[in-house]
A protein has these predicted regions:
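Cytosolic juxtamembrane helix and N-cap/initiation of the first transmembrane helix
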Residues: 1-19, 29-39
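Short juxtamembrane and helix-loop transition motifs at transmembrane-helix boundaries
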Residues: 1-2, 34-36, 60-71
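N-terminal signal-anchor/start-transfer transmembrane helix
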Residues: 14-24, 43-60
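Alpha-helical transmembrane segments
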Residues: 33-46, 107
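Alpha-helical transmembrane segments and their membrane-interface exit regions
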Residues: 45-50, 106-116
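Membrane-helix boundary connector in multi-pass membrane proteins
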Residues: 85-107, 115
Length: 131
């Protein structure tokens, strides 16, 4: 079996914010953890918007119209939530509250890097080099 460096690079980049949050759970706490609250709140807002636009809005439309015919897809703010959460994790290293909230936001942010990897994993044109 041949190692696919594109997939290894994709896993490394897309899950680095998750690894940072897990590392932050075990790191010693800094006194400046409060500086992470603003980027974390902004990242949570963007993540919530992405979750709403990806899952909740189509579900509500389907309930009202009994199908998705005529539904207009609306894009959220991809990657911005992940960047804000990463900044929050860097500012609040060692804070278990910031790390746990960051993991939660990374989970719900469907426009973030981890979700990009999950959604595109089966796309051979993206991850496999041309033969």
């Amino acid at each position: 079996m041949r190692l696919n460096f594109r997939r290894v690079l994709g896993i490394t980049i897309c899950f680095s914010p998750v690894a940072l949050a897990v590392w932050s759970l075990f790191a010693p706490r800094r006194p400046t953890w409060w500086a992470a609250l603003i980027p974390l709140a902004l990242g949570a807002s963007i993540g919530s918007l992405n979750l709403y636009l990806s899952w909740i809005r189509p579900w509500i439309y389907r309930l009202r119209n009994h199908s998705l015919e005529g539904y207009r897809h609306a894009s959220g703010a991809p990657v911005i939530g992940t960047v804000l959460v990463t900044l929050a994790l860097l500012a609040g290293v060692g804070s278990k509250l910031i790390a746990a909230a960051g993991l939660l936001v990374l989970t719900i942010d469907t426009g973030g890097l981890p979700w990009f990897l999950v959604q595109t994993w089966g796309d051979k044109s993206l991850w496999n080099p041309a033969a």
